[in-house]
Amino acid sequence: MERLEGKTVLVTGAARRIGRAIALGLHAEGARVLLHYGTSEEEAREVSELCGGAPLYRANLESAGEIREMFARIGREQGGLYGLVNNAARFTRAPVLEISEADWDFIHSVNLKAVFFCAQEAARLMGRGGGGRIVNISSMGAFLAWPEHVHYCASKAGVVALTRGLAKALAPRISVNSVAPGVIPFEEREDPAIQKMARSTPAGRPGTGEEIADAVVFFLKASPFVTGQVLQVDGGLGLR
C-alpha cells in the first residue's frame, strides 16, 4: 500500500463532523492536509491548529466558479494534489409531497454537483503529478429507502454512480472510490428515529467519525487497482 506521509490531500467540509475526523485521521498518517470550509470558519481554524497549521480554503461549493478558483489557488500554492476527499454534504428531512425545487437544489448542488466539479478540477491537478486518489463520501441512504429523505438519498445514489463513471473515465492514473457511512451521530440529542436505527444494526451501535476516516485512509493508500468501489461502513445496517 502507498504511504500518505508528505502527500497533499484536500478534504471538503473539513470543519465539522465526519470531515473533521477525516482531516485529523489523515494528519495522523503524515499527510499534508488541505482544509476546505464553507461557513464554519471558527471550527475550521480549530481543525487547522490540530493538523499542524493546515492551509484553509474557503469556497461556496454551490458555485462551480468558486470551486475552480479554489483549485486554481491550490495549484498555485501547493503545486499539485495527490488526494481529494469529497466529504461536504447537506442533509435535510421533508415529506416527499412537500419537497420544493429549492429544497431539491439545496441538497443536490452540494451533494452531487459539487462532487463532480471538485473531482474534475482535482483530476487536472493530479495529472501534473502522474495520478492520484479520489474518495467520495456517499451514504447508506443511497441503498436504503428513507421516505422522509428522498431528495438526500437520490443525491447520494448519484454519488455512487458518479464514482463508478469517474473511475472508468480517469483510469488508470487516478483511482476513484466511495465510502458509504451508516448511522454516524454527532449531536448530543440525536433524532430518536436515528438512535433506534443504530440500535437495530447487527453492530448494535452507531458508528464513529474515526471509523469513516479509517475507510478513507484505506482507499487513499490502496493500490490504484482498487477503483470504482463502494465500501459500506454501516455496522451491518444494509443487511436488514
Feature-to-residue mapping (PLM):
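Residue(s) in the substrate-gating loop at a strand-loop-helix junction
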Residues: 139
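Alpha-helical segment proximal to the catalytic Tyr-Lys
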Residues: 124, 168-172
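Substrate-binding pocket helix/loop in short-chain dehydrogenase/reductase
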Residues: 95-96, 103-108, 134, 189, ...
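Conserved glycine-rich cofactor-binding loop
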Residues: 8, 15-17
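C-terminal substrate-recognition "lid" of short-chain dehydrogenase/reductases
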Residues: 208-233, 238
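Active-site helix of classical SDR
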Residues: 119, 155, 163
